[in-house]
C-alpha cells in the first residue's frame, strides 16, 4: 500500500535510501546519489510538505519516493528536446526501494497517474536500471535537463 510518509517513518526511510545508494554504486551508478543523497533535511522537508510517500506491506516499509504536483524548477529548461505538453504535471523524484518488492516503480506510476494525468520523471545518465523501468512504464525520452549536482536524462509520460 502506498501512503504518505509520516515523521515516525524517518529512520526506516533513511535505511531504504542507504540500501538504494549501495545498490546504485554496485550496479555502475556511483555518482547519482554518491554517499549522502538525499540528505536528511530534504527528507524531513518532504515529509513536512506531504511530498514523500512510502510503500508499506504488513507494517514494513519497502520503498519511498517523492511526488510533487506543480511546476518543478529543474524542468524549466530542457535541451535536445521538448515537453510533450505544457499541461499541469506531477513529478516523481528520489525513488528507492529495499529490493524486496517486484514492480515497485509500476505501483508508483499507477498511484501518481491516478492523481494527475501528466507525469515527469528523470534519472541520471548512468542509472541504466531506472532508465529501463521508466521506459518500460510508458514514458519516453523528451530531452536533457541540468540540475545543480549532475546532468540528467529526462523522459516524460506518454499521453
Stretch-by-stretch model annotation:
Residues 126-143:
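Conserved active-site alpha-helix within GNAT-family acetyltransferase domains
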Residues 150-156:
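Conserved small/polar residues in nucleotide/adenosyl-binding loops
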Residues 100-114, 131-132, 136:
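Conserved acetyl-CoA-binding loop-helix of GNAT-fold acetyltransferases
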Residues 115-125:
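Conserved GNAT acetyl-CoA-binding A-motif
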Residues 122, 140-149:
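Conserved catalytic-core motifs of GNAT/GCN5-like acyltransferases
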Residues 1-15:
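A short beta-loop-alpha structural element at the N-terminal edge
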Residues 21-41:
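Conserved GNAT-fold acetyl-CoA-binding loop/helix
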Residues 66-100:
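Conserved acyl-donor/pantetheine-binding loop and adjacent beta-alpha core of acyl/acetyltransferases
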Amino acid at each position: 500500500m502506498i501512503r504518505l510518509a509520516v515523521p515516525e517513518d524517518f529512520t526506516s526511510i533513511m535505511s531504504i535510501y542507504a540500501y538504494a545508494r549501495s545498490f546504485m554504486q554496485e550496479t555502475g551508478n556511483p555518482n547519482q546519489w554518491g554517499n549522502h543523497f538525499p540528505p536528511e533535511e530534504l527528507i524531513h522537508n518532504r515529509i513536512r510538505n506531504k511530498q514523500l510517500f512510502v510503500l508499506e506491506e504488513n507494517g514494513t516499509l519497502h520503498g519511498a519516493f517523492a511526488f510533487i504536483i506543480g511546476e518543478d524548477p529543474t524542468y524549466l529548461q530542457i535541451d535536445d528536446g521538448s515537453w510533450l505538453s505544457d499541461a499541469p504535471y506531477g513529478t516523481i523524484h528520489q525513488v528507492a526501494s529495499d529490493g524486496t518488492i517486484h514492480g515497485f516503480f509500476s505501483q508508483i506510476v499507477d498511484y501518481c497517474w491516478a492523481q494527475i494525468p501528466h507525469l515527469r520523471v528523470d534519472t541520471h545518465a548512468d542509472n541504466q536500471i531506472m532508465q529501463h523501468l521508466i521506459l518500460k512504464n510508458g514514458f519516453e525520452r523528451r530531452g536533457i535537463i541540468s540540475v545543480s549536482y549532475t546532468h540528467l536524462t529526462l523522459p516524460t509520460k506518454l499521453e
